Amino acid sequence: MKKELILKALKLRDMGFPSGDIAEELNISVKTALYLTLNGEELLKAGETPKEDSEKLDIFLEWDNVRASSRRLRNISKIICDMLSDVEFDGIVGISSGGVPLATLISDELDKNFSIYVPKKHVHTEKEKTTGFIGQNMSSIVGKDVIIVDDVMTSGNSVKETIKYLKGIANPKKVFVVMDKSGIDEIDGVKIEHLFRTGVVDIKK
């Protein structure tokens, strides 16, 4: 288990993040997030994950070297633009926060309307929040055909929430993610497209 991942999970836990939000932030499953928040200190002391728990571990995706560079992000956005060549749409919605930089670059490249969806996990309020909201240029996508962009899809919860919200004001046609860990091809009738997808191969000795 990577020490940096454990430390990030513990830091988010101490900041008050629930396991579901930690999972989304670190691109890991909810079970893995819960495991790290409950056992992180012991794992750090031990220096490695106990063998009996190894089958419970999840795949951790890190692409900081890409998203830290606007030039590299633009190259990724051009690949997505190429994948969009046969899709007719009016606007792009980036899911906050990871999908926003890519959605911005894609909208600039294709000269499309741009908007942001802020999931409920990023809405900090004393009252329980049941949904997120459109954070920018809502009027530009109302009644329009739109695509949704995010960086990593882990459980699919944020994408599902975004699709549900947008169906009330627009027509979501497709979802594009850079990396997919969920294995989900479609949510509520909306197709999921990915650049990369992870999977687990069970090799028995």
UniProtKB/Swiss-Prot annotation:
Transmembrane segments: none
GO terms of molecular function: DNA binding; orotate phosphoribosyltransferase activity
Keyword Transcription included in the entry's annotation: yes
Top-rank taxon: Archaea
Pfam families: Pribosyltran
Keywords on record: DNA-binding, Transcription, Transcription regulation
A single BP term in Gene Ontology: pyrimidine nucleobase biosynthetic process
Annotated domain remarks: Contains an N-terminal DNA-binding winged helix-turn-helix domain and a C-terminal regulatory domain (or effector binding domain) resembling phosphoribosyltransferase (PRT) domain.
Protein name: Transcriptional regulator GfcR
Gene name of the encoded protein: gfcR
